[in-house]
Amino acid sequence: MIIYNVTINIDHAVHDEWMKWMRETHIPEVMRSGMFTENRMLKVLGDEDSGGVTYSIQYTCKNMDDFQRYEKEFAPAFRNEYKNKFNDRFVAFRTLLEIVG
């Protein structure tokens, strides 16, 4: 199993709007891609001095083939939508993890 982890620091000024959009729009759209079996959103603790609130959004997929298909067919449009909606109000980085135990 593969976990696609997206860590996002979102500006306090747009936090509530972002949270609503993530829960009601973005995460459901990512899941509708059919490439992931589950997801979860976690708040990063101890990061209060970052100028925003930091979250880890984790999507689980069965294998690398599903992840690579997501990256090729779906991710570019999602990232573009994200950038257009929140522009310079967030910083994100992505990590790919493999469940080994």
Predicted segments — roles?
Residues 37, 52, 60-96:
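An amphipathic, aromatic/His-enriched active-site/gating alpha helix that lines ligand/cofactor pockets
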Residues 14-40, 77-81:
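Short amphipathic alpha-helical segments
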Residues 7-10, 23-29, 60-66:
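A generic short-segment signal for beta-strand/edge and adjacent turn/coil regions
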Residues 8-13, 51:
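N-terminal short leaders/motifs
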Residues 11-13, 44, 62-64, 99:
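Short coil/turn motifs at secondary-structure junctions
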Residues 29-56, 96-97:
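Short, glycine- and small/hydrophobic-rich beta-strand elements in well-ordered beta-sheets
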Residues 2-9, 56:
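Active-site-flanking beta-strand signature of metal-NTP-handling nucleotidyl enzymes
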